[in-house]
């Protein structure tokens, strides 16, 4: 019994010594990690892809196959930006770009169409009533040269006036009387060449030929021999072919970039080898309400008549603006209600800022205001940072500051 009691006593003594030793070692152990955990109070957990949904405990995201991320109390700050773990930004491929100042270049092609030049347009009319003796073999679409005969007419009023003129000449009429009759013929529409012929030959002309007043293409001509024709009836319509018009619809938002003809390059698929010369251009004043475009009209040389009305063409606009603030277009966050970027300050914090966009072209966006030359903006990996800014309240602070400046 004594032996058993001795063994039990030894075991109790050993347990007491072990417990005391464990307590001493536990007290001597550095409390760094415990202290660190205690200092970093967790407010909630969240999925970076759905930052507005918060969870009260860790685990897997119900939206994505990824662990929830803790939001620590010491990350809440009154500063305007947010700080993100560098490992996270590196893994997500966050990249930055510098705000620069320079011209915004613009190069875009627009479909265009060849049409008649409305300034090269002539209407041939009968200046007095008569009847048609002869119609020359012409029809719509035929090309004519200036002075080409269109039809022969007999006009009784002109014949009568010529008879009066010759009678006065024979009976000794005064110069005033004869000149009055000639002026009456001019007002009645008798061609000046026929009047000169009357004076020179002293013979009555009974048949008169109407001729093409310009080079061009007949677009209206529907008369036959033997038809009566009334005063001011349209005999023919002729459209000139040199120069022609080429028109294209361009967005109203880039109209301010159009300055001179050197910015345009014009090509026609039907004649890809042809070099086209633009005489002049004009932006028509009206804006199409449906497409928000303006009509750009070019006057193009067409001496060889290679360009035909109705042909398709391509107009390429190459231009550049005055120097302005530029950022990569992928750095812009456009929600529809506001436009913002994420900048990087001197301390490495990500700060959201509102910007006013002027124009975008070829992956570059020009700004009216909001940034300064030399600032850094995030151009890749925006989603994580913008989500973090939303969670931390940085976006609300940005909007509050913008509202304060506005007032």
From Swiss-Prot:
In the induction comment, the record states: Transcriptionally regulated by CusR in response to copper and silver ions.
Tagged with keyword ATP-binding: no
**Native organism:** Escherichia coli O157:H7
Enumerate the Pfam families for this protein.
CusB_dom_1, HlyD_D23, HMBD
Instruction: Name it.
Output: Cation efflux system protein CusB
Coiled-coil-forming residues are: none
- Tell me its family: Belongs to the membrane fusion protein (MFP) (TC 8.A.1) family.
As one GO molecular function, the record gives:
transmembrane transporter activity
Gene for this chain:
cusB
Q: Which InterPro entries match?
A: CusB-like_dom_1, CusB_D23, HMBD, MFP_Cation_Efflux, RND_pump_MFP
Query: Keyword annotations for this protein?
Result: Copper, Copper transport, Ion transport, Signal, Transport
Q: Which GO terms describe its cellular component?
A: membrane; outer membrane-bounded periplasmic space
- Record has Disulfide bond as a keyword: no
């Amino acid at each position: 019994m004594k032996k058993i009691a001795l063994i039990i006593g030894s075991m109790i003594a050993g347990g007491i010594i072990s417990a005391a030793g464990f307590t001493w070692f536990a007290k001597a152990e550095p409390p760094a990690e415990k202290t660190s955990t205690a200092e970093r109070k967790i407010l909630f957990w969240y999925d970076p892809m759905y930052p507005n949904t918060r969870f009260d405990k860790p685990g897997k995201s119900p939206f994505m196959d990824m662990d929830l991320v803790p939001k620590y109390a010491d990350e809440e700050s009154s500063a305007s930006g947010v700080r993100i773990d560098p490992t996270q930004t590196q893994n997500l491929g966050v990249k930055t770009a510098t705000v620069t100042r320079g011209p915004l270049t613009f190069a875009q092609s627009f479909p265009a169409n060849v049409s008649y030049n409305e300034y090269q347009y002539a209407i041939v009319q009968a200046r007095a009533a008569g009847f048609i003796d002869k119609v020359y073999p012409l029809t719509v679409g035929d090309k004519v040269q200036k002075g080409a005969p269109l039809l022969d007419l007999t006009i009784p009023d002109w014949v009568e006036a010529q008879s009066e003129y010759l009678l006065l000449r024979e009976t000794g009429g005064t110069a005033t009387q004869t000149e009055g009759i000639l002026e009456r013929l001019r007002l009645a529409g008798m061609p000046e060449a026929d009047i000169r012929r009357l004076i020179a030959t002293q013979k009555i002309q009974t048949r008169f030929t109407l001729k093409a007043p310009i080079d061009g293409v007949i677009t209206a001509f529907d008369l036959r021999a033997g038809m009566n024709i009334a005063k001011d009836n349209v005999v023919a319509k002729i459209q000139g072919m040199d120069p022609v018009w080429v028109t294209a619809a361009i967005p109203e938002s880039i109209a301010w970039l159009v300055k001179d003809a050197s910015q345009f390059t014009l090509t026609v698929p039907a004649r890809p080898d042809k070099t086209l010369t633009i005489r002049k251009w004009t932006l028509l004043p009206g804006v199409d309400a449906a497409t928000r475009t303006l009509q750009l009209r070019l006057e193009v040389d067409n001496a060889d008549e290679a360009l035909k009305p109705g042909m398709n063409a391509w107009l390429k606009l190459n231009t550049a603006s005055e120097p302005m603030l530029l950022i990569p277009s992928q750095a812009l966050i456009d929600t529809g209600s506001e436009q913002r970027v994420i900048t990087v300050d001197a301390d490495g914090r990500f700060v959201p800022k509102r910007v006013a966009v002027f124009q975008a072209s070829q992956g570059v966006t020009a700004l009216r205001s909001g940034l300064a030359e030399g600032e850094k903006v995030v151009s890749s990996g925006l989603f994580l940072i913008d989500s973090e800014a939303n969670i931390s309240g940085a976006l609300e602070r940005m909007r509050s500051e913008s509202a304060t400046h506005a007032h």
